Amino acid sequence: MSCHNCSDPQVLCSSGQLFLQPLWDHLRSWEALLQSPFFPVIFSITTYVGFCLPFVVLDILCSWVPALRRYKIHPDFSPSAQQLLPCLGQTLYQHVMFVFPVTLLHWARSPALLPHEAPELLLLLHHILFCLLLFDMEFFVWHLLHHKVPWLYRTFHKVHHQNSSSFALATQYMSVWELFSLGFFDMMNVTLLGCHPLTTLTFHVVNIWLSVEDHSGYNFPWSTHRLVPFGWYGGVVHHDLHHSHFNCNFAPYFTHWDKILGTLRTASVPAR
């Protein structure tokens, strides 16, 4: 159909789809890898470790470049090798021993099918936002329950709070139950919304980045909570208060659920 015969919304949608089509065509050239049962684990580990590494490097550089400490929420804290290595080891162990068998079973039952067409850009952005909002609500409820019910906290969530001052590689330092719960929320949301595979990949990248940033311990001028207006997004300062006080800020990203239930706690952090 000629563009002269298209309505404005159709033209806009087509433009959005054309914008992402080259990227999707490139990814589809790796179709064998994307459809492999190994891909979810490889993708998850490499994305997570890749996002953590810059913060690990910054923590090391803080010893030689004291000016970097002005961006740290806890300027006198830097994780030691004895703290970093168990976190990394547990992430690798859990993905190999627990996540991979589940993805293998899912692959055997329903292999991934890759459509030829890319998603429309606006639809991709809408789906990512909705997935984040759904995940934020689901984890808020899960998190609140695992703090309010002592048995749930001791059995499943306490391990995540072993490090009172958080750092990037501590993001996934958690029990297998917590890891699977978060993974289940991720996959349920993209399935409920019928997300395109490219949208699903993008959402996972965004979700991993936001969770690592929340635990990084660094409050930069470009941190997400500084970019989102009106205090809608909590960010690293918001989550650090949770690790410090335990009884507040249960939502991972946004602040509305904590505001509604009266569990929001804020801190005045000077601009850097």
From Swiss-Prot:
The Fatty acid hydroxylase domain covers 129-263
* GO function terms (MF aspect): C-4 methylsterol oxidase activity; cholesterol 25-hydroxylase activity; iron ion binding; steroid hydroxylase activity
Primary location: endoplasmic reticulum
Query: Which intervals of this chain are the motif Histidine box-3?
Result: 238-244
Q: How does it sit in the membrane?
A: Multi-pass membrane protein
Gene Ontology CC, one term: endoplasmic reticulum membrane
**Might you give the EC number(s) for this enzyme?**
1.14.99.38
* Chain location of the short sequence motif Histidine box-1 per the record: 142-146
**Family to which the UniProt record says this protein belongs:** Belongs to the sterol desaturase family.
* PANTHER family according to UniProt: STEROL DESATURASE (PTHR11863)
* Protein's name according to its UniProt entry: Cholesterol 25-hydroxylase
Originating species: Homo sapiens (Human)
Q: What is the lineage of its organism?
A: Eukaryota, Metazoa, Chordata, Craniata, Vertebrata
